[in-house]
């Protein structure tokens, strides 16, 4: 890939990974409109690593606090709000791990098409709108509980279907379960850490076993661009939803779905 292609795709990944608008729906557009070839495993590793580093850096204090409390709870068996939150995030990760290992190839074979991405972009956009309009209890992330965490984890597993959006599915579920917009987003972002880390490890393993030639310059640029874009995106997303809710992202998803449908019927 040339430098321009690396920057554009890394920007798309970084800006869409944590917004409820589906990164896969956006990454398919350059391929369809510009005829770009698949970026390959090494680039996937790079942009996913950049996004992961961004969320870890942004929530570094919360993550350190949770990790410290969680390790303390394992030793002393005394639970704090932070240790409970850590346990709930671990629990919420399990469905995605199970379905990811058991159905990844099936999903990649049968659901990775522009038709599926267009449909899920629209359907889950409407679900996000409905969830955002529901009357909520205004719960924060420390009030999730194990049952709600498991339901949100199942929603995260559903996001393995391209076009769904991991953040979109988890935020939608969290809103339906009574969390405030900000708490739903924070819980979704924190949930992304173990899943993204696991995915990065698996893709790296596939990369090393594939014998693919690695362009380290493109990889480094992809990490840097996706990190900066994702960090900025997280910061402003939390500000936007506190003032405007999810409506801008719902409208955007519906418009994007319409564009994908237009491409399908061209």
UniProtKB/Swiss-Prot annotation:
- Record's GO cellular component, any one? plasma membrane
Q: What is its EC number?
A: 3.6.1.27
- Principal localization? membrane
Enzyme class, first EC level, given as a word: hydrolase
The membrane topology of this protein is: Multi-pass membrane protein
The GO annotation for biological process reads:
cell wall organization; peptidoglycan biosynthetic process; regulation of cell shape; response to antibiotic
- Gene Ontology molecular functions: undecaprenyl-diphosphatase activity
Keyword annotations for this protein, in alphabetical order, are: Antibiotic resistance, Cell inner membrane, Cell membrane, Cell shape, Cell wall biogenesis/degradation, Hydrolase, Membrane, Peptidoglycan synthesis, Transmembrane, Transmembrane helix
* Top-rank taxon: Bacteria
* Keyword check for Phosphoprotein: no
Reaction it catalyzes: di-trans,octa-cis-undecaprenyl diphosphate + H2O = di-trans,octa-cis-undecaprenyl phosphate + phosphate + H(+)
One Pfam assignment:
BacA
Cellular location(s): Cell inner membrane
**Transmembrane regions listed in the UniProt entry:** 1-21, 39-59, 87-107, 111-131, 144-164, 183-203, 218-238, 246-266
Protein family according to the UniProt entry = Belongs to the UppP family.
Something else the entry says is: Bacitracin is thought to be involved in the inhibition of peptidoglycan synthesis by sequestering undecaprenyl diphosphate, thereby reducing the pool of lipid carrier available.
> Function, please?
Catalyzes the dephosphorylation of undecaprenyl diphosphate (UPP). Confers resistance to bacitracin.
What's the protein called, per UniProt?
Answer: Undecaprenyl-diphosphatase
Question: What is the protein's species of origin?
Answer: Shewanella pealeana (strain ATCC 700345 / ANG-SQ1)
Q: What taxonomic lineage is listed for the species of origin?
A: Bacteria, Pseudomonadati, Pseudomonadota, Gammaproteobacteria, Alteromonadales
- Gene from which the chain derives: uppP
